[in-house]
Amino acid sequence: MAVAAVKWVMSKRTILKHLFPVQNGALYCVCHKSTYSPLPDDYNCSVELALTSDGRTIVCYHPSVDIPYEHTKPIPRPDPVHNNEETHDQVLKTRLEEKVEHLEEGPMIEQLSKMFFTTKHRWYPHGRCRKNLNPPKDR
């Protein structure tokens, strides 16, 4: 069956004839939604146009072109021993220190109780003995 399939690859001129037929000496446009513009030469795909067997649909096949290994460049990786920039561990440590400092700078329990007009006991953490043994089930 695959051998019986016919591939209709057409030239640009034939496609333009189908898109813009001439009727009574005037140019007549068949489809208003479709446009075709040639791709630049350095674009990473090859374009093939075809027409379906009923002649009503133009099909565009554009697979990406494989780039040979000789044309690629390696990603530059700095030497971690002699690199003066921050290492990953240093960045994580500074972020952790920032979070700890941020928690210490927050308002104290007395300030919170004054701001929200509550007692100071509301802002202390509850122990395990006050944990709800029958929490509501998630829906």
UniProtKB/Swiss-Prot annotation:
> Which residues are the transit peptide here?
1-32
Record's InterPro entries?
Ribosomal_mL42
Q: Which GO terms describe its cellular component?
A: mitochondrial large ribosomal subunit
Question: Sorted alphabetically, which keywords does the UniProt record give?
Answer: Mitochondrion, Ribonucleoprotein, Ribosomal protein, Transit peptide
Disulphide bridges, residue numbers: none
- So what family is this one in? Belongs to the mitochondrion-specific ribosomal protein mL42 family.
Q: What is this protein called?
A: Large ribosomal subunit protein mL42
Gene symbol? MRPL42
